[in-house]
Amino acid sequence: FAGPAPSRTAVDTNGNAYVANRWFANVPPVVVKILTEGGIDRNGNGVINTSSDLSNDGVINDAGEILPMADTNGNGIIDCPQSAPFTGCEIQDERIAWAVRVGPNNGLGRSMCIGTDGHLWVGMYNLGQYFKISSVDGHTIAGPVSTTPTAGQPNAGGGTPYGCLVDGSGTLWGANLS
């Protein structure tokens, strides 16, 4: 399998959803922010264009119902300026705030959680690392943060992030597959 593969989701206190796509094709994982309310009127038509259930069957799955987000210029990145003008934006669904790559190639993003400050932690399964990204615009705030403990610490050895949570005191906890 190659390409984007949705792996983990998180929902913030405002109801916005975040989706981490693993990417098995030796490229960095991509995190997408989907707004629960409002949107970004990128085409300037005065309407927030978004994917919708046109067939009224309770599922958005037909090609005509899903507004695409695709690498139309072939540079391997979903391009979209953060502010107007949105010329060349490859995100057509205007409830999608942003899509950003996180970490290096072959990271395989398999862990994502929201911290007490509202920002996201994304774990790289293949690399044993976490990156902290902004919930506002997706830029990297911190990282890489290794899962390999300092020598002499309990459970010495690297972790393969598969799930995570941040407790009330702001401590990042990770779960490994093995």
Language-model-detected regions and their locations in the chain:
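Conserved beta-propeller blade signature
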Residues: 12, 16-20, 119-123, 131, ...
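C-terminal or late-domain output modules
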Residues: 129-157, 161-178
